[in-house]
Amino acid sequence: VLRNGALAVVAGTALALAGCGGHPDPGPLSAMVSPAIPPSVQEIPNPLRGQYEDLLNPLFPQANPAQQRYPAWPASYDASLRVSWRQLQPTDPRTLPPDTPDDRKYDFSAIDDALTKLANRNMRLTLGVYAFSSCCGNSYPDSTNIAIPDWMRPAATAYPGRPNGSAPGVTQVVPNWNDPGYLDAFGQLLAALGRRYDADERLAVFEFSGYGDFGENQIDYPRDALGAPGPAPDESAVALGYYSQSRDQTITATSIRRLVEANVAAFPHTQLVVAPQNPEIVRELLADDVTKKLSGPVGIHPDCLGVQSPLPSWAESGDSHYVQSGDAVVTAIKQRLLSAPVITQWCKLPGGTGPRSYYEKGLHDVVRYHVSMTSSIDFPDRDSTTEMDFGLYLLWAQANSAAGYRYSVEAQPGSQSVRGSVASISVVWTNYGSAAMTEHWVPGYRLVDFTGAVVRSLPATVDLKTLVHDDSSQSREEAVPASSSESVHVDLTGLAPGHYTLRASVDWQQHKPGASHVVNYAPMALARDGRDGSGMYPIATLDVPRDATTPAHNR
């Protein structure tokens, strides 16, 4: 039997009240001590945190036969996929009747297959779409690297491939990012993807799509290898509508607004993230009027963990125009790290960089920049044929274990008290992870009798999303814990004699309106012992003796 309202929770610390003889009466509640499990001891899997299957690649170390010395990493709840526009829309829509349904205009099979397979493993998908990728095809038909449909080639430029490099002699087809035909057709693609997947709870995250190399909002490769740089810094404000310091941008502010509107309109109920290389795209997506249209604030998807900071140089370097001018977008992106997912990808080890300094930087940046998720690929030992050095493994494991939220809860010994028929105890929630949770999880308490039946229930008042410590230290290997306490009050009126436990849980309530596919997860795994079959954790006992007298038993 579940009776709501029989527990009460208020912020603050309960005061012990005087009983007979003026001595404090602790009452019937008694705290159960259960220390938090350190990140260096045990990984705690939960949705949207820790190591994820990047580009559907299995987790490390179990994906590498050379690493059998190390235990398998606990299963992830998340995987990512990027699909080329060419794969999604091979047929020119102008050759089809106007009333052609989406599933005939587009080939959704790669996405559908990934969603189905991941759901069978209790996982969700992070999805992105790209229109150009300089790396790393296994083969190039007709010696051409192209990620847009053939019918879109009039809105692109074909650059002859260099005789040396990663793809010698291969023609590179790069979209003209400001072409109205390109923007219109890509906007229609986004709208179709939204119609099909925005209400699908198997899709957890959609990456802002439509611009840059592999959808990462920069054109370094065309600038460096194809002789196609963006405008010079002193010309960029006029040419683009915003300042570009490194000649790695060619998209205009007007085109950015079109892509932002298309992405936001397509996925209002799905978490969006953005690769932060373009400051104007970040400015638009982090604006308050955009946030109001979405289910949550747009997150950040930086590349190159272990080599580059998760914050782009335009937001952090002392030489940056945006930093020197005190542009508000710098503050906005730094603050956003605290309130939205930060999904990272490791980077290939550069020449001249030692692996220890690489993994140390990765760990320090996970903690400092509130990284939520770390990729399963692209770090030096991922595909190594030799066993990973144990010291390096410890650094790698700590980076993955520290990423994201890591909550625990405990009742405070000695905080219990009783006033009349109401027993109270102070409860502390702590986040030991680098980031706070960003999805809709609801903490609460239940009073459970000796048979395991829930007899009383009430949500907690703590806001777990606020439990994150903002620390600018550049070399911290563990996040600074962030805690909040509240008092739980149990009304003993009408409670039958017996032994009870007060249990805490954090329940999954992340759902989309009118969902086409529903995802339900068990309560959050907390970094402590005692989880029962319902996902609850005992934090205190309550004993009501047979000779107890309450108003209900005096009648």
PLM regions and their residue ranges:
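C-terminal motif of bacterial Sec signal peptides marking the signal peptidase cleavage site
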Residues: L17-G19
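Bacterial signal peptide processing site
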Residues: G21-H23
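Aromatic- and acidic-residue-enriched segments that line the glycan-binding/catalytic groove
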Residues: S134-A167, G215-L240, T291, P297
